[in-house]
């Protein structure tokens, strides 16, 4: 067990599916597509990344010591994230991960493509021009209003 301040006991994270582990990794502060991809490359599966011991994570050489600490602390949010994951369907939101059959092909050529998308509604066909509003899950009230305004204007314009 790590004795550094702020790092709590390491729980037994071994019952998650690959998809659940990936969803949780997408929520770790500072983890983007590149970091998650490098970790998966080193460990083989998202489950192995999620359940890795601190020494294994450090040895992988992907994360700085500070980011290892952030990751270990973030794993304590697992149950909240899983509750959110299983609540998405009720709100009409789909979690689409790279590799899923409905992940947009138009993103595949890009190196910095999103690892996952949260989609409400239907995605357009790959040949159809489209606009997406991308933002933070914890945006300000102004951010919500601005996104809503632009989404409405674009929809009214037939985009």
Predicted regions, residues:
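Short, positively charged patches
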Residues: 4-152, 156
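Acidic/polar, glycine-anchored loop/turn motif associated with catalytic or activation segments
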Residues: 159
């Amino acid at each position: 067990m790590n004795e550094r301040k702020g790092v709590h006991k390491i729980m037994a994270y071994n019952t998650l599916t690959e998809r659940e582990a990936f969803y949780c990794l997408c929520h770790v502060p500072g983890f983007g597509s590149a970091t998650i991809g490098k970790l998966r490359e080193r460990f083989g599966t998202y489950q192995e990344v999620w359940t890795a011991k601190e020494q294994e994570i450090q040895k992988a050489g992907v994360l700085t010591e500070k980011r290892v600490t952030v990751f270990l602390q973030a794993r304590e949010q697992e149950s909240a994230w899983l509750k959110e994951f299983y609540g998405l369907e009720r709100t009409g939101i789909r979690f689409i991960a790279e590799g899923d059959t409905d992940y947009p092909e138009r993103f595949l050529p890009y190196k910095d493509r999103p690892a996952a998308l949260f989609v409400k509604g239907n995605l357009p066909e790959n040949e159809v021009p489209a606009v997406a509003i991308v933002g933070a899950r914890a945006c300000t009230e102004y951010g919500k209003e601005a996104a809503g305004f632009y989404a409405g204007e674009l929809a009214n314009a037939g985009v």
